[in-house]
Every structure is written in C-alpha cells, then in structure tokens.
Amino acid sequence: MGDSHVDTGATSTEAVAEEVSLFSMTDMILLSVLVGFLTYFFLFRKKKEEIPEFTKISTTTSSVKESSFVEKMKKTGRNIIVFYGSQTGTAEEFANRLSKDAHRYGMRGMAADPEEYDLADLSSLPEIDNSLAVFCMATYGEGDPTDNAQDFYDWLQETDLDLSGVKYAVFGLGNKTYEHFNSMGKYVDQRLEQLGAQRIFELGLGDDDGNLEEDFITWREQFWPAVCEFFGVEATGEESSIRQYELVLHADTDPAKVYTGEMGRLKSYENQKPPFDAKNPFLAAVTTNRKLNQGTERHLMHLELDISDSKIRYESGDHVAVYPANDSNLVNQLGKILGADLDVVMSLKNLDEESNKKHPFPCPTTYRTALTYYLDITNPPRTNVLYELAQYASEPSEQEQLHKMASSSGEGKELYLTWVVEARRHILAILQDYPSLRPPIDHLCELLPRLQARYYSIASSSKVHPNSVHICAVVVEYETKSGRINKGVATSWLQAKDPAGENGRRALVPMFVRKSQFRLPFKSTTPVIMVGPGTGVAPFIGFIQERAWLQQQGKEVGETLLYYGCRRSDEDYLYREELAQFHKDGTLTQLNVAFSREQAQKVYVQHLLKRDQEHLWKLIHEDGAHIYVCGDARNMARDVQNTFCNIAAELGGMEHTQAVDYVKKLMTKGRYSLDVWS
C-alpha cells in the first residue's frame, strides 16, 4: 500500500536528522537530494495498470535455484516446459495435464514450479528444437501473483533480457468478480512479448466464477492443433491413460518413517521448528470455540488459536491458513466401496526419475492418511479424472457416460456441468451412482488433487492479542440436487474442535500466516471507512482493536466508521457486544448496521452508504479517508464500489466515467482496499 512508502521515507529522514553532525555541508546537500529523489520515486512513480504492486512475501523455501531447466530438458529429451503459478493447486494440475498431453504429438513435456528455477534461462530455450514454454498462471487476491510465482513476477519487472526466439503461450486462471481479473496471466503474456518472445497461441483466460474447467478444455483443444501447425508435427494418437506413478507397498516399514499428515518434513508435527509457512505449518491449540449467532439455521463461529512460542508474527488484515482434514466417515466409505485396506503402508513413486516431484503427496504413508489429510475428496472431480476412471467401469453405459463427460463435445460439456458440477458430486457420490466403477485405490489417489489450505481473514490485532490468532467463519452445509448433504471440509472440521481436547489430547490446527496488503493507514489520524457484512466483519474486529489500542497509548485516532450487515438483529449479528462497547467508548465513531430481513424491503450496506453520502464524501475527498471492503465479491463488493462511484459522481460533479476513474485511482493509491471472495 502507498503508506508503506511514506513510512520508509519518514524513517530515512529521521535517521538523517540524528546523524547530521557527522556530515559536511556538501554531504548534507547530496544526501538531501538523494532523499528527495527517493521520496519522489516511491510516492509518485506511476504504477503498472496491468497488475498492482504488492509486497513480496517471504517464505522458508530455499533460494537456491536448479542450475538450468534448459539443461535438464536437454538431458531428458523434452522440448515443452509448462510453468505454473498456483496457490490452490489448480494451475499446477492444468500444467501437469498439458505436459502429459505432449506425448500425443511426438513431444515430451515437463511441468515446472518457477520458484525452483532461474527464469533467465528462458533465453537459452531456443537451443532446443521445437521448444515451447507454456505458462499456467493464476491470479491471487487483488491482482497478485501466487506465492510461488512472486520471484518470477519480480524478475519480469526488472529484466531487460532479450527473449527473441523463445516461443510461448499463456493460460491465465482468474475470477471475473474480482477487480483485477486475470492480471497475472495478462501481465506475463504482455511482458514476454515486450521482451521479444513469440506468442504462438492466443492468451487463454479462465474464469473460476463461471466454469474454469470448461474454459481450460476449450482453450486446450484449440491450443494443441495450433502447436502442431506451428511446428509442423502431427498427433500420434488418441488421448490415452498413462500412469505417472507406480505403487510400492511397504510390508515392514518403521512407523517412525511413515508420514501421518505432515505437509513437509517427516515428524515435523512432533518436533516443531520455526519459521512456519505453507510447507511447515504450526500446530496451534484451539483455546476458544464459540458460536456467535443465536439462530439455528446457520452456525457462525469464533475460534482462537494459540501461537505462543511459535515466533509467528502477524498484523491486522493478514490471513490465517489452516490445513483441514476430511471427514473420517467419507474416508471409511471410500475404503469400503473400493474394498481396500486403508491402513496399508504404501508409496506412489514417480515413473519419471528425472522429475522434481517424486510423489503426489508425502510418502510413505497409508491410504487412510492420504485420503484424510492429503487428497481432495469432496470437490467435484475434473474431466481428466473422469476420463482416467472410465476404463474401470465394467458396465458399458457407465463407461460411455464417463467418456462423454470427459469429452470436449457440447453434449459432454453440458452433461458434466449438470451432473457433476451443479449437482456437486464428489468422488464418493460418483462411485455410489456408478456401481460398476471400481478403480484401484492407488490410481484414484494418483488422480485426486491435493487438499488445499483454507484462508481466513484474521479477526484480531496482534497489538492486543500477540499470542493468538482469531478466526470468524460460517459452517458450510447444504443439500445437493441429488439429495445428498454436503459439508464444508474446513468449517465442519473446525466446528468439531473442542478446546477441552479429547482423551487428554489438545485440539490442534495446522496453520500459518499469509501476509496481506489489507492494512490500516500508517497515520492513525487518517479516517477509515470499513464495509463488511456477515463474516466480512472479521478483519475489522482486528482494525478496531488496534485503533482502540492506539488510543490507549495516547495516540490521536481519526474517525472510524463501520458499515456492517446481517439478516436480523436477534439471529446473526456477529460480535454485537464487542462492537457496542467499541462504539460506547468512542473507538468506533459510527456503527451502522443493515438488517436485510427485519423489514419488508431489504436493506443492505450500500443503502446505508448512500444515506451517509455527504459525510462520506467529505472524509474521502477532503480528509483522505481510506476505504476497506471485505466479504462477497460477486454482489456486495461490486454494489459497494458502484455506490462509491455514484457518490463521487453526484457530490464531486463528475461524469460517470470520471467517477469510476476516481475510485480506481483510490485503489491504485492504496486508499480503497479489498479483501473479498466468491
């Protein structure tokens, strides 16, 4: 955010003042010029419009890169490399599918994590005949690259390397409900062209708010013919099932050498060592788990995780990620329907000995552990999984249906959309509905995607709660079109976490903190306008706690306004007592609550913003207020943004297009921040 630059400049100036006696007058003049230049550079340099600036996230991943992916490709006879920027595993999955496709065209592909290589090696790629670099790049949050693509993004911004002769294609993964739709994919595509690389197929833009799988299939089925035409090659055959991993059973393995749910280092949960991140989560004890709402229709909960002695540091506005576990009942049903012994110790070993990815998940382990902690068994499987599974259906009609849903035909796409996606059929439901489909459990484990961490906005301030992280979440449970009851993996698992523990064991949650740009202004006197209905209030609890703490430290604090929304005051008014107390003691200048179902005509937060438009416009236009919006991206965030545009147009005397630009400039300057999801 913009204020981080102001902070840096202010600190530098103070340091100069303290050291002034140590310099000559000439030194002082030169230093002043330098400070002035740096201040101008950081405060007024033009931001790139394609993708917003953001803070580099530090991780514990080794900074040592592989010597050369080009040399590795030469050594293994590959000519296509598919890089992926993936936060939830989907882009990595698409990259693996593309690299696997290559064999049909007499080519050999490899999927690669850009974090593991020096991308400057791209300039040497033309040394390989018919070489091609493909980039499956997801956009995370508000236009950010994924964590593993951060270094790649930084390199693209800084390099002037000549990439003439490099052939490339890009498929982006994004969500149209977000302001910066597919920013990373668009930026990579544009920047590679600027550096001289040759695009051989049009940029693909997948929309997760629509049907990301269909978007990818549509792009992919046009991509490969274009590759064949460009390089003058022909397809060698139909798509076929090729195992990537072989099953290895371990009869007498030492239990101490078997993974039991760890994400990275073996026994890391027994011997915890900081720093903690996605590959080394901290086991935090649940100290509080209480229901926030009064109604019985939904369960909204507040959890507190103990991070004492972890050395984990967080700031208000950051996200906490938790690794959940699948419902043991679902796991047992899968084992039963497949006739498998879930407690067999096994490994899935990559048949490609040169691959960096030796196993699809930590091995050796048991099927039970894999299905509980490592594999996603509750989301609808993608079409490539159905294609691979079809061979195991002994009933011809079931095999035909599976092949049809995995095809690129219009009828097949429609069937997949209605029968799998919209009906929310997970793998167990598909096995139940297709009685002849009984794949080997090891192949199923190879095909299923990894179970991903779930991210929540932290509902506390580290100034007030340095040793705990608070979570606010709604338990997900719904009936599908097929009449089944589906439950949210993480929220159902968290709901069952009893602070009292079980059988003398504490309730533990594997977690880590991901830094965010959703930050309070550097100056405490800056007014803040917070808009967060439902669980979108979570980060604002931390913001308000921090503003209260600043007041207690004797700091002057600017106006603090909250626009919160829920259904009814006696049903789902979250943190009601806490918010009332903050309002009473003056921390909250205004507490504005929209109850959508307490009157005939529904009232939402945007209606209250419109009601208060004169005061809000003064705070924004004259007093430099910062706006924060948290919650639903599809409807609420869009409606709130439109409301602020309308306020700017009406009270600022602007045309609609000018008002839209005005709000977008607030975003560019870090004065309009979003923490939204769809």
Swiss-Prot record:
Q: Which Pfam families match?
A: FAD_binding_1, Flavodoxin_1, NAD_binding_1
UniProt keyword terms in alphabetical order:
Acetylation, Endoplasmic reticulum, FAD, Flavoprotein, FMN, Membrane, NADP, Oxidoreductase, Phosphoprotein, Transmembrane, Transmembrane helix
Q: Give every FAD-binding FR-type domain span.
A: 279-521
Kindly list the positions annotated as binding FAD: R424, R454, Y455, Y456, S457, C472, A473, V474, Y478, G488, V489, A490, T491, W677
Lineage, top-rank taxon, reads Eukaryota
* Residues spanning the membrane: 22-42
Task of the protein? This enzyme is required for electron transfer from NADP to cytochrome P450 in microsomes. It can also provide electron transfer to heme oxygenase and cytochrome B5.
Name this polypeptide is given: NADPH--cytochrome P450 reductase
Q: State the taxonomy lineage.
A: Eukaryota, Metazoa, Chordata, Craniata, Vertebrata
